[in-house]
């Protein structure tokens, strides 16, 4: 069995907890996730099953949408409510100033990842160092905040919906907003509403899954990759491309755009993987068959 499960992760579970439960239901089938969702966060967590695990990296390139709750007036070590409190301050701000500051983060910005994150530096996870009381300098990374919509303000709490690029840490965003408002801030709640083609409305709660019904919720791998355009390989090229030989025929190359990834199909609408037109030839980047 190969495909994706669109899981609605509950609060309090790690992403690996979800993987382990799914693996148990599928009797130790190869299972993995497409990107960590913090234990205190809930929402969309796509789980790859079987050969779909080979395509996990191609699913994290997409936009993500979160519903976040920011608690102003408090700063914690982890930038969320579960961390030790570092500082507290009174919140004496006008709503219009809060809104203006939050919206100023829209666009391409630079963000410093939190110490409590799964990022690796010199082979070590940052959270492993943080738990030992070690803080190291982290390089700023370019991210994109496509949009922010304020949902509600009941000080000291502010709820907002954010659409962002991969690699965005909402905890860092909340911390930065609090710092700029000179009162501190920490992420209080977080729900991922969507990632790529996976939406919370179409997700399945983990508690409803069991070994009897889980198979009917597995989505074909190519549906998870609908963000990439498709291209059909004619019969005359199928043997070549399946054996790792590039297609150099201009009539085929003209159907694709240089340096762009494609979902590749053969006759019968059979998905065979991801390919790319690079250096005047089309070649498979990742095979599904």
Curated annotation (Swiss-Prot):
Organism: Clostridium kluyveri (strain ATCC 8527 / DSM 555 / NBRC 12016 / NCIMB 10680 / K1)
Key words of the record: Isomerase, tRNA processing
SUPFAM superfamilies: Pseudouridine synthase
Function: Responsible for synthesis of pseudouridine from uracil-55 in the psi GC loop of transfer RNAs.
Enzyme class: isomerase
HAMAP family reported in the protein's UniProt record: TruB_bact
Catalytic function, reaction form: uridine(55) in tRNA = pseudouridine(55) in tRNA
Secretion signal span: none
A molecular-function term among this protein's GO annotations: tRNA pseudouridine(55) synthase activity
Name of this protein: tRNA pseudouridine synthase B
PANTHER family: PSEUDOURIDYLATE SYNTHASE TRUB1, TRNA-PSEUDOURIDINE SYNTHASE
EC number: 5.4.99.25
Protein family per UniProt: Belongs to the pseudouridine synthase TruB family. Type 1 subfamily.
InterPro entries given in the database record: PsdUridine_synth_cat_dom_sf, PsdUridine_synth_N, tRNA_psdUridine_synth_TruB, TruB_C
UniProt superkingdom: Bacteria
Cited Gene3D superfamilies: Pseudouridine synthase (3.30.2350.10)
Active-site residues, Swiss-Prot/TrEMBL: 38 (nucleophile)
GO biological process, one term: tRNA pseudouridine synthesis
């Amino acid at each position: 069995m190969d495909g994706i499960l669109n899981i609605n992760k509950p609060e309090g579970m790690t992403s690996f907890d979800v993987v382990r439960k799914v693996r148990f239901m599928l009797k130790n089938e190869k299972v993995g996730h497409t990107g960590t969702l913090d234990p205190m966060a809930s929402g969309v967590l796509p789980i790859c099953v079987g050969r779909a695990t080979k395509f996990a990296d191609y699913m994290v390139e997409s936009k993500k949408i979160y519903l976040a709750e920011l608690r102003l007036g408090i700063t914690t070590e982890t930038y969320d409510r579960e961390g030790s409190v570092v500082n507290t301050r009174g919140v004496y701000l006008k709503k219009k100033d809060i809104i203006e500051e939050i919206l100023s983060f829209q666009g391409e910005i630079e963000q410093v990842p939190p110490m409590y994150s799964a990022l690796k530096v010199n082979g070590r996870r940052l959270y492993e160092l943080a738990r030992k009381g070690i803080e190291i300098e982290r390089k700023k990374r370019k991210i994109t905040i496509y949009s922010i919509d304020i949902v509600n303000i009941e000080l000291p709490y502010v709820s907002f919906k954010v659409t962002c690029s991969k690699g965005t840490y909402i905890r860092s965003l909340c911390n930065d907003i609090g710092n700029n408002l000179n009162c501190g801030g920490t992420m209080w709640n977080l729900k991922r509403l969507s990632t790529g083609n996976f939406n919370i409305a179409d997700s399945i709660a983990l508690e409803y899954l069991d070994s009897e019904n889980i198979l009917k919720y597995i989505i074909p791998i190519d549906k998870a990759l609908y963000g990439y355009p498709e291209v059909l390989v004619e019969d005359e090229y199928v043997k070549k491309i399946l054996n790792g030989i590039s297609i150099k025929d201009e009539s085929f190359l003209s159907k694709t755009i240089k340096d762009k990834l494609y979902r590749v199909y053969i006759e019968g609408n059979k998905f065979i993987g991801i390919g790319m037109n690079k250096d005047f030839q089309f070649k498979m980047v990742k095979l599904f068959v």
